[in-house]
A protein has these predicted regions:
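Acidic, mature catalytic/reactive cores of soluble proteins
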Residues: 1-307
């Protein structure tokens, strides 16, 4: 981690006494999923916890930093015991988290609206239930500047959507979240929601973060999902003439998700995760390194004939 980021993390405001934020234990990296739209990325754990995301850009300060021991997470998780799983929709970075519970099967489809806007991120989460009602706990606890600043100036409008400030960012949370409770979180606030989704129904959650005030209406979840599906279908070629085409398309989707509108491709979405334990090689990967960008280009050059 660079010194500036480390200092901000070390100066993070202490949590108020009595505030119990469920901090999930870390998992092996292979158990996490990546959501990315070209301008930023989010890392999702098997419990439905978003444990890493920088906003509004790859190299901005993290608003969810629990992956590296900081504060901030956005969790949509079953209330009762479950067995987790999940998969990417082919040729995209649309993730379907899946939990088998005693009552049925819960799915949470999630993505960053694609392609991304450099100033404004839209994080889509859609919960469905099969075989029985989905009972979930939802917690939105973003923390600006690697955990230093909690959500403030929080209010609810006539549509039931929430809006507030997060450091220098503007936040809006919509999708039938009017019943969410405001809880104290240090010197700011967090939102908690008990969610019950009947079998066959769907519940959308839409989180927006921007470095500019919201001048437009809140996001229509159904329209945003359609646009994201279409954009991924157009962005990832069939690659029918290569070996292991499905894997190749997924790799292509990952590289596209890491590539911004400027043409630069970040090495990875995260920072400071060691390559090996106590090896002293903890790099900030959220930048376009020439070596890391050149290697995929060399590997993908033969596939250009299949497009």
């Amino acid at each position: 981690m660079d010194s500036a980021a480390r200092n901000r993390l070390d100066r993070a405001a202490p949590r108020a006494a009595g505030h119990q934020q469920d901090r999930a234990a870390p998992h092996a990296l292979r158990d996490y999923a990546l959501l990315a739209d070209g301008e930023r990325g989010a890392v999702v754990g098997p419990r439905g916890e978003i444990v890493w995301m920088c906003a509004p850009s790859w190299d901005s300060d993290a608003v969810f930093a629990s992956l590296i021991g900081g504060e901030g997470a956005y969790t949509v998780t079953p209330e009762f015991r479950s067995v987790w799983g999940g998969y990417y929709e082919e040729g995209s970075l649309i993730w379907r988290g899946r939990w088998v519970t005693d009552e049925g099967v819960i799915e949470c489809r999630e993505a960053l609206a694609f392609p991304g806007d450099a100033h404004r991120l839209v994080l889509l989460r859609s919960v469905t239930a099969d075989g029985g009602p989905a009972r979930l706990s939802v917690s939105l606890d973003p923390r600006a500047e690697f955990g230093r600043k909690a959500l403030r100036a929080l209010g609810r409008d006539d549509t039931g959507s929430w809006a507030g400030r997060l450091g220098d960012l503007y936040l809006r949370w919509s999708g039938d979240v009017g019943d969410a409770r405001v809880l104290r979180a240090g010197r700011g606030s967090r939102l908690a929601l008990h969610l019950v989704v009947p079998p066959g129904a769907r519940h959308d959650l839409v989180l927006e973060l921007s470095d500019q005030p919201f001048d437009e209406a809140q996001v229509d979840a159904a329209a945003a999902w359609r646009a994201t599906e279409t954009a991924w279908a157009q962005a990832v070629p069939p690659l029918g003439g290569v070996t292991a085409g499905r894997d190749a398309r997924h790799a292509y989707a990952v590289l596209r998700g890491l590539t911004s509108s400027s043409g630069g491709m970040v090495a990875a979405a995260t920072t400071s995760l060691p390559e090996r334990a106590e090896a002293g090689r903890n790099y900030d990967y959220r930048y376009a390194w020439i070596r890391d960008s050149a290697t995929p280009g060399r590997r993908w050059r033969p596939s250009a004939r299949t497009r």
